[in-house]
């Protein structure tokens, strides 16, 4: 395509890469601790298994305990466990899930828009090294999405995301080079077409 001198090329747009604000980053770094307003709180804290207990609540079936598989569950015990994970805990957990969904969608949209812009330019060849750069960014974003999943599954964990700004800057620099080449070709084409028009208009 680069050797095609009869048609112009579209410039490449580099969309903004998804990032989390400081407040969201702090939430990821902060262990989500269950409430102390339950007689079971100290026991769970000593065991260090709040995440395990929280996940087990989803498997409660009538009186059968999901932890020991015995018929040991009654309403008082179930309320005591539920009280460990109070409204504040549930709201923070919902915040984490919202962060994951928004970040995951933004990552997918970023890669999709970038690839579309490269294809739409009509200039970038399949073997251009920019595709490898995009793959690296995609891999780092995928690792971040997995880290956010881990935070949801283990709210007591403290996590931080990989800084992909270096990869982003490399892609940005590459796109500037490609756009410079595209502009040069388009300028030459426009100059050629202008010359042809001037010549033919005088005939």
What are these regions (language model features)?
Residues 1-62, 69-203:
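"flanking P-loop NTPase cores in genome-maintenance ATPases
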């Amino acid at each position: 395509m680069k050797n095609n001198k009869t048609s112009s090329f579209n410039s490449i747009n580099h969309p903004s890469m998804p990032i989390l604000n400081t407040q969201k980053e702090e939430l990821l770094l902060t262990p989500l601790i269950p409430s102390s307003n339950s007689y079971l709180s100290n026991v769970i804290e000593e065991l260090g298994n709040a995440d395990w207990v929280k996940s087990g609540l989803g498997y409660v079936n009538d009186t059968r305990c999901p932890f020991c598989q015995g018929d040991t569950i009654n309403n008082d015990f179930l309320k005591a466990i539920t009280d460990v994970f109070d409204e504040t805990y549930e709201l923070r957990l919902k915040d984490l899930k919202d962060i994951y969904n928004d970040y995951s969608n933004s990552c997918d949209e970023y890669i999709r828009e970038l690839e579309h812009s490269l294809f739409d330019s009509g200039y970038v060849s399949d073997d251009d090294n920019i595709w490898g750069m995009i793959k690296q960014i995609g891999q780092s974003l995928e690792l971040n999405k997995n880290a956010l999943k881990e935070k949801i599954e283990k709210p007591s964990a403290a996590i931080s995301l990989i800084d992909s700004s270096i990869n982003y800057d490399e892609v940005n620099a590459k796109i500037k080079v490609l756009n410079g080449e595209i502009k040069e070709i388009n300028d030459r084409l426009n100059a050629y077409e202008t010359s042809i028009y001037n010549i033919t208009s005088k005939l």
